Regions:
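N-terminal secretory signal peptides that target proteins for export/translocation
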Residues: 1-6
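Bacterial N-terminal signal peptides
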Residues: 10-19
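Sec/Tat signal peptide C-region and signal peptidase I cleavage site
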Residues: 22-26
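N-terminal module-boundary/linker segments of secreted carbohydrate-active enzymes
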Residues: 27-53
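Domain-level detector of nuclease and nuclease-like folds
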Residues: 55-216
Length: 216
């Protein structure tokens, strides 16, 4: 099995504050109406941290094995989340339209766990106002619009870096991305996610509420 954590783990300075989730939980006046939101957050999860934390918890479930038991990943797509300027919608259709298996399997190169894909559709995709296929096409388009800095594609040893330095690396690699459109989240001194704000047509845009909750 690839030495995923040992050689690929990405560390955040232990002095950093822990971060909360993007956006407040309070809903705005639109009350989870599908398609009624202000912008997207593309959330990119740092896979080595996820796998290391899962190992420490003794979590060897099917979803963990799908991401952590095969080829080593760096950043994987956690999701594309509709957001309000303050807060976010979720689970906008109950019951949610059934996600076709062929759509799920088509996304495994970006989101390497079936359970994650189904959950993202139920929780976030149903709020996009898009059909199943169009929503996951939007995820693929959003991911293609973001270039991962070269130095984080193939780490050979643990690395410690400040969140601002990581943000700067993404900004340099992605013309048009500003520090008001990106945030870095961490957990227990490890990199957790990079979150990038995008307009509904998937262009980089500022998001003060999301950035305010980043690691600093």
């Amino acid at each position: 099995m690839p030495r995923l954590v040992t050689i690929s783990r990405f560390l955040i300075s232990a002095a950093l504050m822990l971060c909360g989730a993007a956006g407040a939980s309070a809903q705005d006046r639109r009350q989870n109406a599908p398609g009624e939101f202000d912008f997207y957050v593309l959330s990119l999860s740092w896979s080595p941290s996820f796998c290391e934390a899962a190992s420490e918890r003794g979590n060897n479930g099917r979803g963990t094995q799908a991401q952590c038991g095969g080829r080593p990943y760096s950043f994987v797509v956690h999701g594309l989340w509709p957001q309000y300027e303050r807060g976010f919608p979720e689970y906008c259709q109950r019951p949610s339209p059934r996600l076709a298996r062929n759509i799920m399997t088509s996304m495994l190169d970006l989101m390497p766990a079936p359970g994650l894909i189904y959950n993202e559709w139920d929780k976030h995709g149903t709020c996009s106002g898009l059909g199943e296929r169009a929503y996951f096409e939007a995820i693929r388009k959003a991911r293609a619009a973001v270039k991962i800095p070269e130095e984080f594609l193939q780490l050979s040893e643990p690395k410690t870096i400040a969140p601002d330095e990581l943000e700067t690396a993404f900004i340099k690699a992605n013309p048009g991305l500003s520090n008001s459109a990106i945030s870095v989240t961490c957990n227990s001194g490890r990199l957790s996610e990079v979150r990038i704000c995008m307009s509904k047509d998937l262009q980089f845009r500022a998001c003060e509420e999301v950035d305010r909750r980043a690691c600093r």
